[in-house]
């Protein structure tokens, strides 16, 4: 249970970190969309391990294979199956974790729920599960771009107390990808890289915030009450590994304002369309998109698996210690950026198809 996401554009991810591979089944993709493995690979390369000195040294090419649902470069409207094979698993690094639980990891809770767990690489709780999401997100991005020129750009906003100044209305993918930490503020990026280097040497980890901007989203996406657009985005983001917080629009800072200060006043643009002069609502009002940029921030905790010795317990009821072996990110933020973009794209694409089905039929 809990392995499927979406309503009309629906994905199911599968696989474990040290199994034969990981992947995704995509159901509900419109037919005749031109798509190639190379297009999907672009985002998978942004997510893959071993890409820089501040990410896990695990070396995986993460080459995607499209097994079904695409013929002669176009989608068929049938389920699309995408597989990425695991090539560089070192399961022996996890032998100690077969018995000992990693503090703040999913080891103990998975075993409490199922009575069994795959301790090799964390199994299903590993961030390698997100490969399927990123692959599906690449397809969703293309649908959104072709429909309304929708553009999704995520970037590292902060790491610990180092916070970047970024204009979410104008930031580009090229600026985000200009450095290994994926922060478009070059001065802050250098400080972030230095901080990650520091904790890596200390066998520790750190967290931070990814900000995501969705531009050119049409008005009308989202459903009243339980399927509000920001509610679905929150669920999507909080389903990612290591997430601990979600903020939309003005977020918690909005609680410091009065209604007259916070309200986004309307005006008519040159084309006679209503717009808002400010965007404290974050592009969504009443759970429905208003045509302004959709802005959100996601907090990621420090990576749970660290090399420092910590107190823990074993699954045979003993108090013990653990200094985790294996290869792990000292900071998940740089590789979380394409994951955030993918989940945003999946939500927007699903709501776009729902909007078309309900409101564009007559």
UniProtKB/Swiss-Prot annotation:
Family that this chain belongs to: Belongs to the chorismate synthase family.
Keyword Cell membrane recorded: no
A GO BP entry: aromatic amino acid family biosynthetic process
Pfam family, one: Chorismate_synt
EC supergroup of this enzyme: lyase
NCBIfam families: aroC (TIGR00033), PRK05382.1 (NF003793)
Cofactor(s) demanded: FMNH2
Subunit architecture: Homotetramer.
An MF annotation (GO) of this entry: chorismate synthase activity
Reactions mediated catalytically: 5-O-(1-carboxyvinyl)-3-phosphoshikimate = chorismate + phosphate
GO CC terms of this entry: cytosol
Superkingdom of origin organism: Bacteria
Pathway participation: Metabolic intermediate biosynthesis; chorismate biosynthesis; chorismate from D-erythrose 4-phosphate and phosphoenolpyruvate: step 7/7
Residue sites binding FMN per the record: 124-126, 286, 301-305, 327
InterPro entries, sorted: Chorismate_synth, Chorismate_synth_AroC_sf, Chorismate_synthase_CS
Task of the protein: This reaction introduces a second double bond into the aromatic ring system.
EC number per UniProt: 4.2.3.5
Name of the protein this chain belongs to: Chorismate synthase
């Amino acid at each position: 249970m809990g392995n499927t996401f979406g309503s009309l554009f629906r994905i199911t991810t599968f696989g474990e970190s040290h199994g034969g591979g990981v992947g995704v089944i995509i159901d509900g993709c419109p037919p005749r969309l031109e798509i190639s493995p190379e297009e999907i690979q672009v985002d998978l390369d942004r997510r893959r391990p071993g890409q820089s000195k501040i990410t896990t040294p695990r070396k995986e090419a993460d080459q995607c294979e499209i097994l079904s649902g695409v013929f002669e470069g176009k989608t068929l409207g049938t389920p699309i199956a995408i597989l990425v094979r695991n090539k560089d698993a070192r399961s022996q690094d996890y032998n100690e974790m077969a018995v000992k639980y990693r503090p703040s990891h999913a080891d103990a809770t998975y075993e409490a729920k199922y009575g069994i767990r795959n301790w090799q690489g964390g199994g299903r709780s590993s961030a390698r599960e997100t490969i399927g999401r990123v692959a599906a997100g690449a397809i969703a991005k293309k649908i959104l771009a072709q429909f309304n020129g929708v553009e999704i750009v995520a970037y590292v906003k902060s790491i610990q107390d180092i916070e970047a100044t970024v204009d979410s209305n104008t930031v580009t993918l090229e600026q985000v990808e200009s450095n290994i930490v994926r922060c478009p503020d070059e001065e802050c990026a250098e400080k972030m890289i230095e901080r990650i280097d520091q904790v890596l040497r200390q066998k520790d980890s750190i967290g931070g915030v990814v900000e995501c901007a969705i531009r050119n989203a049409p008005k009308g996406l989202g459903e009243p009450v339980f399927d509000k657009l920001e509610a679905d985005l929150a669920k999507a983001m909080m389903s990612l590994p290591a997430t601990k917080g979600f903020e939309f629009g003005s977020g918690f800072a909005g609680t410091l304002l009065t209604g007259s200060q916070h309200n986004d006043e309307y005006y008519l643009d040159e084309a006679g369309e209503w717009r808002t002069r400010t965007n404290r609502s974050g592009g969504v009002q009443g759970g429905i998109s208003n045509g302004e940029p959709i802005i959100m921030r996601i907090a990621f905790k420090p990576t749970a698996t660290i090399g420092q010795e910590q107190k823990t317990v074993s699954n045979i009821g003993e108090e013990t210690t653990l200094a985790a072996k294996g290869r792990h990110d000292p900071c998940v933020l740089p590789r979380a950026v394409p994951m955030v973009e993918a989940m945003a794209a999946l939500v927007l694409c699903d709501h776009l198809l729902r909007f078309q089905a309900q409101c564009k039929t007559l």
